Amino acid sequence: AANVLDSGKTLKTIFISNADPDFYFGAEVLKEMFPQAHVLTTAAVREKIEAKMAGKVAFWSPKMGANAPRHPILPEVMKGNTLTVDGELIEVRGTTGALAHRPYTWIPSIKAIVGNIAIFGNLHVWTADTQKPSERQAWFAQLDELEALQAKTVVPGHMAAGTDRK
């Protein structure tokens, strides 16, 4: 947020790429800072957020205290599968199939994958949400899809501080 404010540019879109609360709880704060910005996600991510938001807020609020969302935002469903930032195309991929609720963004001009929860950087992978063999196979297939892009930069959905993103 500080980089956007310092740039003097107008933030138009806040994209939520996953239905886990660590991906959307902060949207409330960003929306307060950038009230003109639209908070968007895919249909599958919104469906998961909508189904679980009340329970996630009830569980996490006591643990987060003053940092818990007061009015969590349910993102709007984006139209299409692309966004633009400063004229650069950003593709939202992985929006169909078993992992439609775990999309990723691909920036073709710089060959970058950004923010996919399937990718962990220097952390043990979280497997509690993929316990069935079919879910693990879908995860492996998505990783194969990501690898086939031959990205020059990969920003994991979760990473330890200092993780190299190249």
Can you say where each PLM-predicted feature lies in the sequence?
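Divalent-metal (often Zn2+) His-rich catalytic cores of metallo-beta-lactamase-fold enzymes
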Residues: W106, A112, Q137-K166
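Metallo-beta-lactamase
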Residues: E47-H101, S109, E147-Q150
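Extracytoplasmic/secreted cell-surface and envelope-processing proteins
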Residues: D22-F25, K48-E50, L123-H124, T163-K166
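Active-site metal-binding loops of divalent metal-dependent hydrolases
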Residues: A1, N18-A19, A44, I117-A118, ...
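Conserved beta-strand hairpin/beta-sheet module of binuclear metal-dependent hydrolase folds
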Residues: A1-D6, Y104-I107, K111-I117
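Structural recognition of the beta-strand scaffold that forms the well-ordered cores
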Residues: K12-I16, H38-T42, E91, Y104, ...
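Active-site metal-binding motif and surrounding structural segment of the metallo-beta-lactamase
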Residues: A1-V39
